[in-house]
Amino acid sequence: MEGAKPTLQLVYQAVQALYHDPDPSGKERASFWLGELQRSVHAWEISDQLLQIRQDVESCYFAAQTMKMKIQTSFYELPTDSHASLRDSLLTHIQNLKDLSPVIVTQLALAIADLALQMPSWKGCVQTLVEKYSNDVTSLPFLLEILTVLPEEVHSRSLRIGANRRTEIIEDLAFYSSTVVSLLMTCVEKAGTDEKMLMKVFRCLGSWFNLGVLDSNFMANNKLLALLFEVLQQDKTSSNLHEAASDCVCSALYAIENVETNLPLAMQLFQGVLTLETAYHMAVAREDLDKVLNYCRIFTELCETFLEKIVCTPGQGLGDLRTLELLLICAGHPQYEVVEISFNFWYRLGEHLYKTNDEVIHGIFKAYIQRLLHALARHCQLEPDHEGVPEETDDFGEFRMRVSDLVKDLIFLIGSMECFAQLYSTLKEGNPPWEVTEAVLFIMAAIAKSVDPENNPTLVEVLEGVVRLPETVHTAVRYTSIELVGEMSEVVDRNPQFLDPVLGYLMKGLCEKPLASAAAKAIHNICSVCRDHMAQHFNGLLEIARSLDSFLLSPEAAVGLLKGTALVLARLPLDKITECLSELCSVQVMALKKLLSQEPSNGISSDPTVFLDRLAVIFRHTNPIVENGQTHPCQKVIQEIWPVLSETLNKHRADNRIVERCCRCLRFAVRCVGKGSAALLQPLVTQMVNVYHVHQHSCFLYLGSILVDEYGMEEGCRQGLLDMLQALCIPTFQLLEQQNGLQNHPDTVDDLFRLATRFIQRSPVTLLRSQVVIPILQWAIASTTLDHRDANCSVMRFLRDLIHTGVANDHEEDFELRKELIGQVMNQLGQQLVSQLLHTCCFCLPPYTLPDVAEVLWEIMQVDRPTFCRWLENSLKGLPKETTVGAVTVTHKQLTDFHKQVTSAEECKQVCWALRDFTRLFR
């Protein structure tokens, strides 16, 4: 919103429309207009005026939120001499509005906290606030709100205050932490039975624990700690207060993760949590699920904190295994949501025990894990009145999947075979109800693959028993037994006499709609593992493939079946493969031809993606072993299918989704036959370029990268592929030149640099000598700022591989030429690249991208270290040394230390470490 400042009346009207306009389009217009206002420089004055006038809750909330947002994102707009008056104004507003609405108080508290963090001239802000407001009981609630959000905002991603300022703030808050704790004690004394005040005290204390600035020796003997456990032990504590106290205890436990340096507090918390077992049982008896979940969170956090002690000194001191007993008590609760809270701890325990690899230690924990698995098997039971198959996508289905993953991770402590046999014996010896049988089969399916299939009579017996299950058993039992058979495909491979009965059992499932997809998945597994044995059944698989749509399968299951069929097809004799592949593809090709001949307006779906996906999976997994000189058996089939794919692509050229599936299908066709697809190269490239000039689908760039990968080393193809690249670059660059082109088209950036990288890998000299290399590199430099994981990764990989070409394979005859060409490119753009990479790291990209950036800088250094040293020095000179408010972002010593660390690095990871530390100064 540029230009004149809008009137307050206009702002009020927009706020009213946002909240009360019955027309959604009116709300949308108001929201857009107010968003523009918030981004403008007028927002400061307008929001201040709205807060002074206090006309209604809505306008005050908008103004408070705007103030917070402006301070977080646009603080640089204000002159330094206005900061003190802004602070005083905000403190006046929060005092005047303290009774209007809690959400307004929170927004203003955040604004004050964010201001304090960015205002180095406001020294000792905690002391100032406490002195100003602690003696007025009516001001205590908003004072506590400010003191709660202040530590939370220190690590806020919205504020780029830098590591130096952050360190200064944390030291300042640590210095005043005892003042805050004393204030909280005073609040407790004044609160009496005021529950809301107690909740605010606990929230504030938890916030300071989370920042890690409270003195643990001081806190170990503090009355606040005793009060927390007193509240949690009392049966009459309300749900809200209980949650606040639980959150605070969890924060305290998290804060003492380094147990040895916080021993007195660790001991107090440890003893305190152990006293909560009785209170947990009382909550269970009262069926108070909220409190039960809170206790389980506390018990889990206790175990997480003392994990090292539990593993290293089980049963001794802070390794006391009563902690695990508490979690197993929770695992016994009938609601599965309770045990689910502890899953992360059990994963971590399994991980630690796996690394210790100590049989004696493992033996201590075995009984605990067995009890956990029995509890989990019980939690996995469906309701006795459940009808049909188990749901996999609802909350309970997702819980069962997480159980399956956890069991796989912990089974080594019990032993797969021992556990499998125990589970099977419960089915064999008893006559459990169907829901128990199904849950046991589900756990057996989770561990079946980890049981050694060699000469294992129990596995054989289980397989025999399952395939003989009568059709009268509950559908869910049949469903899970089919999944178990699929997981036991290794056993079938070792015992081929079971192949026929197993396939017969699965075929019955395939013919019933509820079981069809599970059966298809199991057949796919059998095909994958028993490829050689399944060759004799190929005709049966072909019959299934021909009538695929009659089986009522999910699209994924149908594709899985075709994948299995293709894997078996690849094991047939070479002379049979061409004919069989043609048969396998013919159903899909006929369907595509039928769609092509249809008039688009007759109401029937003309979407070819199902058939394209099926062809893609067939090409992807038909990978026979072909000796040099032999014609690829799939070549003829793919050449025959090409006209249909080409016509489909042409018909749907404007539809990105369908074109993407066409390209994917062609990609696997090319990969399938490799150099055998040479006859398609010319027509395919011509069609790609023609369509791309009109419709910039990025998948054409990706398909181009596949062609370069397959043919880039063929002398006769290089010029044609370069022509393709140059032709594709023209519309690509035009697309990226549009406003916000990079941000709006990350897929195009990703695929463009995949294509360019393939060129560097397969035919570097061709690209380096071309006219297009400098524009591509310039776009790569511009794209380094793009905060998109895949696109940024592709850009960095291109830059790394491009520069590496100047030093790689120095024994090859084109080495000197490559070295010279890279030298020319770097002379032209090296300084710009280094400056951009440094700026990008400090201001644009998240920390996870730093290893990729470090690799690029490392490669530049390998080409010419002295020149790189100069470039880096120039780049560092261009960085801001102070914030707009005068806080030191980076000192001269920090700059010189970083320069030295990078330029003297002997490994790439040292560059990465230096970057990590340095960029924190700007975050």
UniProtKB/Swiss-Prot annotation:
GO terms for cellular component: annulate lamellae; cytoplasm; cytosol; nuclear envelope; nucleoplasm. The modification N-acetylmethionine is found at M1. The modification Phosphothreonine is found at T896. Changing R671A: Abolished interaction with SRSF1. In 9Ala; abolished interaction with SRSF1 and CPSF6 without affecting interaction with GTP-bound Ran. Pfam families: TPR_TNPO3_IPO13_2nd, TPR_TNPO3_IPO13_3rd, TPR_TNPO3_IPO13_4th, Xpo1. The keyword Protein transport applies. Changing R667A: In 9Ala; abolished interaction with SRSF1 and CPSF6 without affecting interaction with GTP-bound Ran. The modification Phosphoserine is found at S74. Changing D750A: Abolished interaction with SRSF1. In 9Ala; abolished interaction with SRSF1 and CPSF6 without affecting interaction with GTP-bound Ran. Changing R664A: Abolished interaction with SRSF1. In 9Ala; abolished interaction with SRSF1 and CPSF6 without affecting interaction with GTP-bound Ran. Expressed in skeletal muscle. Changing Y702A: Abolished interaction with SRSF1. In 9Ala; abolished interaction with SRSF1 and CPSF6 without affecting interaction with GTP-bound Ran. GO terms for molecular function: identical protein binding; nuclear import signal receptor activity; small GTPase binding. One of its GO terms (biological process) is protein import into nucleus. Its main location: nucleus. The keyword Phosphoprotein applies. Keywords: Acetylation, Cytoplasm, Disease variant, Limb-girdle muscular dystrophy, Nucleus, Phosphoprotein, Protein transport, Transport. It is found in: Nucleus envelope; Cytoplasm. Interacts with (GTP-bound) Ran. Interacts with (phosphorylated) SFRS1 and SFRS2; leading to their nuclear import. Interacts with NUP62. Interacts with RBM4. Interacts with CPSF6, promoting its nuclear import. Importin, which transports target proteins into the nucleus. Specifically mediates the nuclear import of splicing factor serine/arginine (SR) proteins, such as RBM4, SFRS1 and SFRS2, by recognizing phosphorylated SR domains. Also mediates the nuclear import of serine/arginine (SR) protein CPSF6, independently of CPSF6 phosphorylation. The nuclear import process is regulated by the small GTPase Ran that partitions between cytoplasm and nucleus in the predominantly GDP- and GTP-bound form, respectively. PANTHER family: TRANSPORTIN 3 AND IMPORTIN 13, TRANSPORTIN-3. It is linked to Muscular dystrophy, limb-girdle, autosomal dominant 2: An autosomal dominant myopathy characterized by proximal muscle weakness primarily affecting the lower limbs, but also affecting the upper limbs in most patients. Affected individuals also have distal muscle weakness of the hands and lower leg muscles. The disease has generally a benign clinical course but some individuals with childhood or juvenile onset manifest severe widespread myopathy, leading to wheelchair dependency and respiratory insufficiency. This is Transportin-3. It comes from Homo sapiens.
